[in-house]
Structure formats: structure tokens, C-alpha cells
Amino acid sequence: MAVALNIADLAEHAIDAVPDRVAVICGDEQLTYAQLEDKANRLAHHLIDQGVQKDDKVGLYCRNRIEIVIAMLGIVKAGAILVNVNFRYVEGELRYLFDNSDMVALVHERRYADRVANVLPDTPHVRTILVVEDGSDQDYRRYGGVEFYSAIAAGSPERDFGERSADAIYLLYTGGTTGFPKGVMWRHEDIYRVLFGGTDFATGEFVKDEYDLAKAAAANPPMIRYPIPPMIHGATQSATWMALFSGQTTVLAPEFNADEVWRTIHKHKVNLLFFTGDAMARPLVDALVKGNDYDLSSLFLLASTAALFSPSIKEKLLELLPNRVITDSIGSSETGFGGTSVVAAGQAHGGGPRVRIDHRTVVLDDDGNEVKPGSGMRGVIAKKGNIPVGYYKDEKKTAETFRTINGVRYAIPGDYAQVEEDGTVTMLGRGSVSINSGGEKVYPEEVEAALKGHPDVFDALVVGVPDPRYGQQVAAVVQARPGCRPSLAELDSFVRSEIAGYKVPRSLWFVDEVKRSPAGKPDYRWAKEQTEARPADDVHAGHVTSGG
């Protein structure tokens, strides 16, 4: 009897096909598929024994490491729903996420125990807490935390979880339009089709049989995949699940270090490298330019999976690593994979963020009609077919993003684009307002709210300014209260208690009055012009920003 397209089932097919193959490597540690199965089963049973029920939410608050893969698989085996927790979040953001997700259990690294201890009194529904040792000494027993391996040791290693459903929910938390995280709800079958390997991205056709990937795994040696970004990103979750379903090997590292990346590729003979645009590509190039004795002959694909990276960096990578393929992929937590641009040695490629979209992705104008190639019209990227159910506990935002137009249901998260004459699509950005800093989305309204909490700030707008490494950096245009002129260092210290560090402004412009519409709506075009007209009045130490 066919098994539903459930993530746990798909992983178990590969486990059965290649039990002795290495599934995951991190540093000097590694697990075979059979060992991963044993530990994930034990975790699943432990969660169930602690009262975690089907569709309960379990947070995962860790950097990349072996235990994060055990936890991902164990959570879905238990029938629970994984909640990805950004380890950069400060306490206010954690409190919101724990509460909004209705989290009942948490797996976290010990280094975050103090933050967790401060948040738990306001989130009493988080009852079961497993702590992964990481060499730090923060006290987790004060709130009932239990060491990860001690907790799962008593769990059953058996795979006896009953039937599963393709309609089970997979939750991807992403920043909302106000900056607050929103949980995007996917059916397991749908996210498998668009993000986790259930579609041949070259042809756009579905993988026909749920056992096909596992059968191919048994018949072929494994590819070695190395996703660099943290697992909090859907892109790295995607790369990891794809590898698990197809019996491949995933290499992880807890931190990004360019030299260590190349050493790891050399050591483990990595075939596919995944990263996030220029923020990672530039240091990787710099490390290669310095010269090395690494054997990188195994590497044939370099893929940017969360932020487009510049043509100059592609050119340099191809120069340093000839005969490789480089790809840019577009997509989002709301759409999954949407399209790609591919560049290999000797191939022509344009200078803009241009991709070829798949046949389930379109660009729609304001009237809901498809934008014609070469028309020069701007439209929004819209995805049909396998798309999310909606946002968790947010009917209003669900109705805004997931719309039915001419009888077709689309996911329209707000990414603007135009269609070129050859059918490729040039990306213009999310509402032309959000800031993409090294692959991290920053939404202006959240930063503005934090800034305006400072007693010396009357009003503020936040925009992105160009940055050679990160693509963009966060800049603030501030109207101070009369007689006040807060320094960037003061504002930095103040807002860090409200927002994660990567959202904090790196440059500051003062104006007599922030320009808004009569209805109070912000004029971001005007704010951007202020940053381009003259040098910043104050910049973060070590970061130089000038007009133009």
C-alpha cells in the first residue's frame, strides 16, 4: 500500500535503502542513516512520553550541528511540528515567537539558557525542554531543562508511530511585513514538491513515486552537500531534507568561516556548496585569492539559495574554480522554489538579478493579468499549484498573500519583477522596501518602532543602502526631538534590546522633518534620496557610508 507523502515517511524510505551510509557530518562527528534513525526514534518517543501530541509545536533553537538533524527528524516522526528559532533573536523576539507558535517543547543549545530562562515565565505552555551541551556553563536546570542525550536515552528506538498523512503541517517561520515572525503553514506533500526534492527542478516534473529517491540512493554513490547558512533558513532546511530523502550526505558547520569552508570541502570531498549571496561569496573568494593547497576537484556546483549574488563575484568564482556551475535561485517561505539562473564557464550571463522562472510561477499586473514579456511593466511574482495553506493564526495576512484570481489560487508574497523579452524575469525586490542584508530580511517598520522608543527620537524611517559585502546595510533617517541629537552608538545600544543585531542601523542621517503623506504613510523614496544626497552624519565604527 502506498504511503502518504509525509516527510517522516520519505526520510524512512532512504534510511531503509542505505542504513550504513553516512547521513550527516559536523566537525569530527558523523552519523550513519541507521544511527540517525535510532536517535530520532528515541527523541520522538521521549517527546510523546512527555505529552507532546500530534500537531504540537516544538522549537529548535540551535546553530548547525549533528543534534539539529536528529531533532528535525525526531520531531516530524513524533507527528509534531518543528518551529525554527532564529538564534540571533533577543528576548522580546523569542517571547513573541514562543507565544505566537503555541510552542510546548524546546530543544536549545546551552549557550542560550539565560535567554530562555528570562522568556519562560511569560510562556508557561513551553513545558518540555531538552538542552544540547555546547561547552558553555549557563544553568538550565533552574527551569527544568534536561540534557539532550540523557533525555532520549530512555526513549524507545522502535519505529512504531502509526500511519501518517500528506496533510500534516510543516511550519516555516519568516519575518512578516511588520518584522514580526509569521508561521507559513505547508502541507507536507506541498513543501516536498516545491522545496524538498519532490520535483525535478530541471524539467519541472514531479518525482513519480515516493520510493524513487530512495531507490536511486541505493543504486548510486552519495553526493556530498554542504549548506553553509544556519538551519533557521528554509534554504538550509530544504538542502538537508533533500539530502536525507535521497540518501545523500550533509555536511554542517556551526559558524561561517571562509577558510574553514574550503578546508571542509577538501576534507570531505564536497560536491555541492550552498550559500547566501555576496555576504558569503565575497569572503569565500578572498580566501581563495590568498592561495591554498586545497583539492577542490570534487566540487562542481555552487548555489546561492537565499540572496542573488553579483555578476562580478560569479566571474571571480568561475575564474578561480573553472568548469563549475553557479546558480541563483529565487523563492520564499510562501512560494518555495520559483526559478533559477545558471552560469557556467563560457556561458553568457547578464549583470542584473535575472532568473528563469518555472512553469508554476507567473508575474501578474495590478489587474491580475500576466505581464507580457518585454512590456517593461512591473508586476508581482505569483506562485500557483503546491502552495501553503496560509499563515498560522493570521487570517488577515493569509487573505492578503494567498489570493484567488480568475479561479486560480496564488501565493503572492509581494516580490516585484518585470518580464524580459526572452521570458526571463528581473527581480525588483519585496515591495521595493524591505532590506536584504547578507540574505537576512530586514523590514523597516520594526526597526523604526525600536528607534522611536528612544526618548530623543521624534520620528524615523529606515532604508537599505549599498554595501559591498552584504548587498545592503540598514540606514536610519531620523528626526530628533528639539535640542537633541542622539549618536548612532546610543541608538545602537538602545535598539539592541528590542531587535536582533543584524537589524540595527549601521549609518544615520538627521533631517529637520521626516516626510510622510497627509495620512501619515512613510515616503521611503524621499528617505532613500536623503541617504544618496550626502554622507551620513554618523556611521557604525568600521563602516563607512557616503552619499551617491
UniProtKB/Swiss-Prot annotation:
Keyword Secreted part of the UniProt annotation: no
Binding site for ATP: 174-182, 415, 430, 521
GO cellular component, one term: peptidoglycan-based cell wall
Reactions mediated catalytically: a medium-chain fatty acid + ATP + CoA = a medium-chain fatty acyl-CoA + AMP + diphosphate; a long-chain fatty acid + ATP + CoA = a long-chain fatty acyl-CoA + AMP + diphosphate; (25S)-3-oxocholest-4-en-26-oate + ATP + CoA = (25S)-3-oxocholest-4-en-26-oyl-CoA + AMP + diphosphate; hexanoate + ATP + CoA = hexanoyl-CoA + AMP + diphosphate
Compositional bias ranges of the Basic and acidic residues kind: 520-541
Record EC number: 6.2.1.2, 6.2.1.3, 6.2.1.42
Family named by the database record: Belongs to the ATP-dependent AMP-binding enzyme family.
Protein name per Swiss-Prot or TrEMBL: Medium/long-chain-fatty-acid--CoA/3-oxocholest-4-en-26-oate--CoA ligase
Keyword Lipid metabolism assigned: yes
Gene Ontology terms for molecular function: ATP binding; decanoate-CoA ligase activity; long-chain fatty acid-CoA ligase activity
Signal peptide from the UniProt entry: none
GO biological-process terms attached to the record: Actinobacterium-type cell wall biogenesis; cholesterol metabolic process; fatty acid biosynthetic process; lipid biosynthetic process
Chain's role: Catalyzes the activation of medium/long-chain fatty acids as acyl-coenzyme A (acyl-CoA), which are then transferred to the multifunctional polyketide synthase (PKS) type III for further chain extension. Catalyzes the ATP-dependent CoA thioesterification of the sterol 3-oxocholest-4-en-26-oate to yield 3-oxocholest-4-en-26-oyl-CoA. It can also use 3beta-hydroxy-5-cholesten-26-oate.
Pathway(s) where this gene product acts: Lipid metabolism; fatty acid biosynthesis; Steroid metabolism; cholesterol metabolism
Swiss-Prot/TrEMBL keywords: ATP-binding, Cholesterol metabolism, Fatty acid metabolism, Ligase, Lipid metabolism, Nucleotide-binding, Steroid metabolism, Sterol metabolism
Region annotation (Disordered) ranges: 520-548
Catalytic class of the enzyme: ligase
